[in-house]
Amino acid sequence: MAAKEVVFGNDARVRMLAGVNILANAVKVTLGPKGRNVVLDKSFGSPLITKDGVSVAKEIELEDKFENMGAQMVKEVASKANDAAGDGTTTATVLAQAIVVEGLKAVAAGMNPMDLKRGIDKAVIAAVAELKALSQPCADSKAIAQVATISANSDESIGEIIATAMEKVGKEGVITVEEGQALENELDVVEGMQFDRGYLSPYFINKPETGSVELDHPFVLLVDKKISNIRELLPILEGLAKTGKPLLIVAEDVEGEALATLVVNNMRGIVKVAAVKAPGFGDRRKAMLQDVAILTGGTVIAEEIGLELEKATLEDLGTAKRVVITKDNTTIIDGNGEQTQIAARVSQIKQQVEESTSDYDKEKLQERMAKLAGGVAVIKVGAATEVEMKEKKARVEDALHATRAAVEEGVVPGGGVALVRVASKIADVEVLNEDQKHGVVIALRAMEAPLRQIATNAGEEASVVANTVKNGSGNYGYNAGNDTYGDMLEMGILDPTKVTRCALQFAASIAGLMITTEAMVAEIPQNASQDMGGMGGMGGMGGMM
């Protein structure tokens, strides 16, 4: 086991604080509408330019082990805020730094670290309750656009495109962000349920100009097995021929004689039919077939539940308004399933998302939920260069997370105003002693830090701006974008309540632990040339390093 270096008391805290300040100072320059960019060196490819706090934090590793511990703990604040709310990483870092700086001053002055931490915790609990009281629901498209615009560093085009996407696919819909090919941002919306399986034979194509299959008002047959014998399909096909309606077959596979017969019948115009493989594999395929069944009002024909394909009737089939099949995708539009059953299925999947511990499973479940609930929107980010593309894509992703958080828990006045107003209401939190009272004061001072940093980044005097805002009331605050004061809600400067809440809670949690640190332990770095010198008869090899 390698030898360790141990530092105690004030020496430990000073070195830890140095690391906190290095990381926080690099991150906080990005805060607010006039925040600056940070350039990150990459081992391959061009440097990355970003205004995303967590991206900056993740890049920072310090040479001094003890300083690095401080930096890593603040990095944890940014990462936690990013995981929970998807945004607010810079705010969380600024809050954490403010609490640590003031807290360590108090510890150096002889106050009890544990009481300081308890005071900070009490203030944060009271602040979270006040934030919830201050919060307003984010219901309309205009508010959604405003939240997205603020999170995307005042880029209105991003705000508008996210609001449009949310309007089209609903709150449960999936919105993904991709790198586009054009100079402008583009929005593609896939309505209905789409899965990544194309037609099993090009002979099903009935729209040669687009190379696709289009079926109007088709029946949908769902089978959880391979179909190779045409005899199994005959009862369904005979019943179908009488109705004159087309048929979509979704099965594990359709092959051999069965596929050949379907192709021949389709080409002769006897029965209009198309077959595709079922999406997914294993248990996920069963679940997705059931999703399609509920969406179309049909039944999955599966032998394990006692249903045989030969005995299936038209009543077991689902129906839809339209189906479009390309060589890669199948889209079912306006399935005729019962809305109550679809809603029940969506809430069931939502429950599974909450219980799942795997990020991959969560993502797949959310995709299924979106396909049932509304659809999928793809925002294609456009830019002139790859460097700009990456920076813009990160901002779009942040804005998207912030918007979801706003829909979930509502919005509060932005620009750091919400925390200033909350701080003024919780000054008289009950405490047991003077040290705890000072802990509350530390938290209240820290709550001004985001507003002060926004003002500093805008080139203004932070104390003047903070006092002007504190002397106001309600939603009155400072708009750094155009250097004016006024009602933040009327000016459209909104922050998601969840983002502000998570930033405060995570910052206080980790900063409180740092204040109570009394000793730090780290490995003593070993000299590489000394390591080589220990090899018998090869002492001279040290110079080769």
From Swiss-Prot:
It catalyses: ATP + H2O + a folded polypeptide = ADP + phosphate + an unfolded polypeptide. Gene3D superfamilies: GroEL, GroEL-like equatorial domain, TCP-1-like chaperonin intermediate domain. InterPro entries: Chaperonin_Cpn60_CS, Cpn60/GroEL, Cpn60/GroEL/TCP-1, GroEL-like_apical_dom_sf, GROEL-like_equatorial_sf, TCP-1-like_intermed_sf. ATP binds at residues 30-33, 51, 87-91, 415, 495. One of its GO terms (biological process) is protein refolding. Transmembrane segments: none annotated. One of its GO terms (molecular function) is isomerase activity. It holds the Pfam family Cpn60_TCP1. One of its GO terms (cellular component) is cytoplasm. Its EC number is 5.6.1.7. It comes from the Bacteria. It is found in: Cytoplasm. The keyword Nucleotide-binding applies. Keywords: ATP-binding, Chaperone, Cytoplasm, Isomerase, Nucleotide-binding. Its main location: cytoplasm. It is an enzyme of class 5 (isomerase). Belongs to the chaperonin (HSP60) family. Forms a cylinder of 14 subunits composed of two heptameric rings stacked back-to-back. Interacts with the co-chaperonin GroES. HAMAP family: CH60 (MF_00600). Together with its co-chaperonin GroES, plays an essential role in assisting protein folding. The GroEL-GroES system forms a nano-cage that allows encapsulation of the non-native substrate proteins and provides a physical environment optimized to promote and accelerate protein folding. This is Chaperonin GroEL. It comes from Shewanella baltica (strain OS185).
